[in-house]
Amino acid sequence: PRPVGVEIPVNIWNTKVDKIPQDLVGHPKSGPILNTDQIEEAATLLNKSHKPIIIVGGGAQNFSVEVNQLSKSLSAPVIAFRNGHGIIDGSSQLSVTLPAGRELWGECDVVLAIGTRCQTAQMQWGIDDHMKIIHIDIDDEEIGRINTPEIGINAYLKDALPSLLDNMSGKEKYRNDWVKKV
């Protein structure tokens, strides 16, 4: 699940083949299997948090509904990096810009990183000792690449986010002081 560039010479574009050699047929590796224990652990940590933040990247583009539900149930601001813009409506009270997110970053206690490398936040904004990071990504090489998260979940978001929402259902907590800060 990384970006891939394939270069095909122009003289090959219109070449006809009768049969594709079997040794050229790719065999995709099977995807990660959702670890429900990690999801439960993440739900518990998020429910106990006082100042959660959600960070989204391009990997979360098709999961706007789930991200918005998580944001509302946690009263958590959402910071969108690069390809994560548009996942949450920019006019939402819980949508924050990068400069505002930078200010909130130092105060948050739990970060839920969804489909993002979380590179800018971790490398430029820093990590405080009290901050716990939950990182959900399909690419296991991205999880812990910069900093070891409290919980690293290697999973398809189509499996992880509904499961996380189910585990958090009925435990929504409005964080009035945190929302006012946003």
Spans of model-derived segments:
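Phosphate/diphosphate-binding loops
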Residues: 98-143
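Short beta-strand segments
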Residues: 7-9, 55-57, 113-115, 137
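Short beta-strand elements at the ligand-binding edges of bilobed clamshell
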Residues: 27-33, 90-101, 145-159
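Glycine-rich beta-alpha junction loops
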Residues: 8-14, 58-60, 85, 140
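Aromatic-enriched
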Residues: 10-34, 175-178
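Anionic-ligand anchoring segments at beta-strand to alpha-helix junctions in alpha/beta enzyme folds, i.e.
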Residues: 34, 41-108
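Phosphate/pyrophosphate-binding active-site segments
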Residues: 5-7, 19-21, 44, 49, ...
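Short acidic, glycine/serine/threonine-rich loops at helix termini
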Residues: 15-20, 63-69, 89-93, 122-126, ...
